[in-house]
């Protein structure tokens, strides 16, 4: 029983938000109040504990999710601080996959921003229960209630407002707690915020507090039947009953508790920690994790208990100067001992566990074992990458992995010397292990190495890391759009025979395939392979070679040399020769048949479309819209926000280079914009013609 009790007191949470909403500052305050750090690290001093990479301290943004553990009122809170910049979506996606709950931090002035929406949707995808902290209420222009309304309008959230602020901007001194109906204030000399005073609710806020308390009870009644019954009968609710109902609604994903304050001014952080413990789930509150047997079909479950067989998911790889490769892992069931042997069921490879570390942002403590509910880093894994399952060899299971977006931008990189060339290949291999959205290919024609990623900042930082961590000196080309190719219709019975039977050992392979398009949304795979051969007409050992050959050919496309995506290849039939057939022969046949089939399947060019949001004064609205239209943009919505107009549009990335300068000159620097990848869409024929001609040099 003790083990289950201990798990009930664990909270695995992420802190997520838009860039600059104050996520890292909030996390730093949590570490301070829970006694992990003795001096608060300020982001703007470049001293935050969680921002441990050199680039993060220079740029004041969080790039990699730092993991850390702290204690609060008898509970263990494991926190992952995630980046808010859109180029690092992959880090957010990975963290959410292994968390039980999250705190969304909002900027009280800006409200719900584009990346907030993005992260919220990612959290919806993994059903992560979450609460909200409206931060920066000490800043000019802060508006708590507008921010709450935006949660409803933009996120489709059901906010449970548990606090209202006492004063805003310079007068922000505390919050009214609507559950206990009391005021919590941080005044005077307790600037560090260690102590807060509990007072009567100020008279001028009594009506507001009563109104929002009533709204809180109404919302709870809407989402919880037990509250509804008592509420309709006019019964009184104890504090315990209200808290239990909020917890039920939060864990079920029906509502989101909202708290507020100013982390930088040390106001509102302790009540937020209380809420994490009171309302966010422990590993026992969330459903058992679903997986499949090694056949990829039989459904299996793993409960969060130490008596179940061990299973865990690798969600991040990091290279440490002293320890080499570290694999971050969430343990879902059982116990993991250092030195034990486990199986990587995703790849069907054995792995030996080296040392196990409990991570703080940039320090670590060694542990002899880890158990269900832990988030740890493991040394010594050779074959494991992000999204792989590790499990007990006697009870294998494959847990659901993660899907990552296709990169949208690429640059050519040329090492300055021969020595740099060698260092570059090591650097690229390491960085690609750490980051699934970073891709590399060799351009056959120019001999250049081309790297691609999620945006200019992403590539800047990767190139910067190559220089700092691996001493690679290289020339970097101009950023190019990462176009893709796809097919529009299904083709059947396309065949290819590869034979070379002149003297010595020959080569022979014949394959017949069908090729069909897959949906191009972000949650669908970009490639699927199916084997429908019957009667051993192609021996089993050659089938993976056909798949491998096809995947090789896909890298170089058929129209203009861009990778082919969104296709499903089915091997229908084929033929082999007792002596002359080999894996190599079938690999070549797989590669050639894919090209032939794709040419017949009405190929098309795809380009990345960006969701662009421009905030502009009313008088520049016409210019902004005209400019978006001239860039082949599609206006999707226009709305008013805090006295300015907001235009939301989908615009091809190729038309967005240099946009920041144009927008500045059209609006005298008064407009701002943000953009993030939305989806791939077909390039209009006239534009496609130009791109293909340029790529093929015709």
From Swiss-Prot:
It comes from the Bacteria. Residues 8-284 form the tr-type G domain. GTP binds at residues 17-24, 81-85, 135-138. CDD domains: EF-G, EFG_III, EFG_mtEFG1_IV, EFG_mtEFG_C, EFG_mtEFG_II. InterPro entries: EF-G-like_DII, EFG_II, EFG_III, EFG_III/V, EFG_IV, EFG_V, EFG_V-like, G_TR_CS. Keywords: Cytoplasm, Elongation factor, GTP-binding, Nucleotide-binding, Protein biosynthesis. It is found in: Cytoplasm. It holds the Pfam family GTP_EFTU. GO terms for molecular function: GTP binding; GTPase activity; translation elongation factor activity. The keyword Nucleotide-binding applies. Residues 289-309 are annotated as: Disordered. One of its GO terms (biological process) is ribosome disassembly. GO terms for cellular component: cytoplasm. SUPFAM superfamilies: EF-G C-terminal domain-like, P-loop containing nucleoside triphosphate hydrolases, Ribosomal protein S5 domain 2-like, Translation proteins. NCBIfam families: EF-G, PRK12740.1-3, PRK12740.1-5, small_GTP. Belongs to the TRAFAC class translation factor GTPase superfamily. Classic translation factor GTPase family. EF-G/EF-2 subfamily. Catalyzes the GTP-dependent ribosomal translocation step during translation elongation. During this step, the ribosome changes from the pre-translocational (PRE) to the post-translocational (POST) state as the newly formed A-site-bound peptidyl-tRNA and P-site-bound deacylated tRNA move to the P and E sites, respectively. Catalyzes the coordinated movement of the two tRNA molecules, the mRNA and conformational changes in the ribosome. This is Elongation factor G. The lineage of its organism: Bacteria, Bacillati, Actinomycetota, Actinomycetes, Micromonosporales. The gene is fusA.
């Amino acid at each position: 029983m003790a083990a289950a009790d201990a798990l009930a007191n664990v909270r695995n949470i992420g802190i997520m938000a838009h860039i600059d909403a104050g996520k890292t500052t909030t996390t730093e305050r949590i570490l301070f109040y829970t006694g992990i750090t003795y001096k608060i690290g300020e982001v703007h001093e470049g001293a935050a504990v969680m921002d441990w990479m050199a680039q993060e301290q220079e740029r004041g943004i969080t790039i990699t999710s730092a993991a850390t553990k702290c204690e609060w009122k008898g509970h263990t809170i494991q926190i992952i601080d995630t980046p808010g910049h859109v180029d690092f979506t992959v880090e957010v996606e990975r963290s959410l996959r292994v968390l039980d709950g999250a705190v969304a931090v909002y900027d009280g002035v800006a409200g719900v921003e584009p990346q907030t929406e993005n992260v919220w949707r990612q959290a919806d995808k993994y059903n992560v229960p979450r609460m909200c902290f409206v931060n920066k209420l000490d800043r000019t222009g802060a508006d708590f209630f507008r921010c709450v309304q935006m949660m409803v309008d933009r996120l489709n959230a059901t906010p449970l407002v548990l606090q209202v602020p006492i004063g805003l901007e310079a007068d922000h001194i505390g919050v009214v707690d609507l559950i206990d109906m009391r005021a919590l204030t941080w005044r005077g000399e307790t600037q560090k915020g260690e102590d807060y005073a509990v007072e009567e609710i100020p008279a001028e806020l009594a009506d507001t507090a009563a109104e929002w308390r009533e709204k809180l009870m109404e919302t709870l009644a809407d989402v919880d039947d037990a509250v509804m019954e008592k509420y309709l009968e006019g019964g009184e609710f104890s504090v315990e009953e209200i808290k239990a109902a909020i917890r039920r609604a939060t864990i079920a994903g029906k509502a989101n508790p909202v708290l507020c304050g100013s982390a930088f001014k040390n106001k509102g952080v302790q009540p937020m920690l209380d809420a994490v413990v009171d309302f966010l789930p422990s590993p026992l509150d969330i459903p058992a994790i679903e997986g499949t047997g090694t056949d990829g079909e039989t459904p299996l479950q793993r409960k969060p208990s130490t008596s179940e067989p061990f299973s865990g998911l690798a969600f991040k790889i990091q290279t440490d100067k002293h320890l080499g490769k570290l694999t971050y892992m969430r343990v879902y069931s059982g116990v993991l001992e250092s030195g034990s042997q486990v199986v990587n069921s995703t790849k069907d490879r054995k792995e030996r566990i080296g040392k196990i570390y409990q991570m703080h942002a940039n320090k670590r403590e060694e542990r002899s074992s880890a158990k269900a509910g832990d988030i740890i880093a493991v040394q010594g894994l050779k074959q494991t990458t992000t999204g792989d399952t590790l499990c007990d060899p006697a009870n294998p299971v494959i847990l659901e992995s993660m899907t990552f977006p296709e990169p949208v931008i690429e640059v050519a990189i040329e090492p300055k010397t021969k020595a740099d060339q060698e260092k570059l290949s090591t650097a690229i291999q390491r960085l690609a292990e750490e980051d699934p959205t970073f891709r590399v290919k060799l351009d056959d024609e120019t001999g250049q190495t081309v790297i691609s990623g999620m945006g200019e900042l992403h590539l800047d930082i990767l190139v910067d890391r190559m220089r700092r961590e691996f001493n690679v000196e290289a020339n970097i080309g101009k950023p190019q759009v990462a176009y893709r190719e796809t097919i529009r219709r299904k083709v059947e019975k396309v065949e290819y025979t590869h034979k070379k039977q002149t003297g010595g050992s020959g080569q022979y392979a014949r394959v017949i395939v069908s090729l069909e398009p897959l949906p191009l949304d972000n949650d669908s795979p970009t490639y699927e392979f199916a084997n429908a051969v019957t009667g051993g007409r192609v021996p089993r050992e050659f089938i993976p070679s056909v798949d491998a050959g096809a995947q090789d050919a896909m890298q170089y496309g058929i129209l203009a040399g861009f990778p082919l995506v969104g296709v499903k290849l089915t091997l229908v039939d084929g033929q082999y020769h007792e002596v002359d057939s080999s894996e190599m022969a079938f690999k070549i046949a797989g590669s050639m048949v894919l090209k032939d089939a794709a040419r017949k399947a009405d190929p098309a060019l795809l380009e990345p479309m960006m969701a662009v949001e421009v905030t502009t004064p009313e008088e520049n609205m016409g210019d902004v819209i005209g400019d978006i239209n001239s860039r082949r943009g599609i206006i999707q919505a226009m709305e008013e926000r805090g006295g300015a107009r907001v235009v939301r549009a989908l615009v091809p990335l190729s038309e967005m280079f240099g946009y920041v300068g144009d927008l500045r000159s059209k609006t005298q620097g008064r407009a701002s914009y943000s953009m993030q990848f939305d989806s791939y869409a077909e390039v209009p024929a006239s534009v496609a013609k130009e791109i293909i001609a340029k790529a093929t040099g015709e």
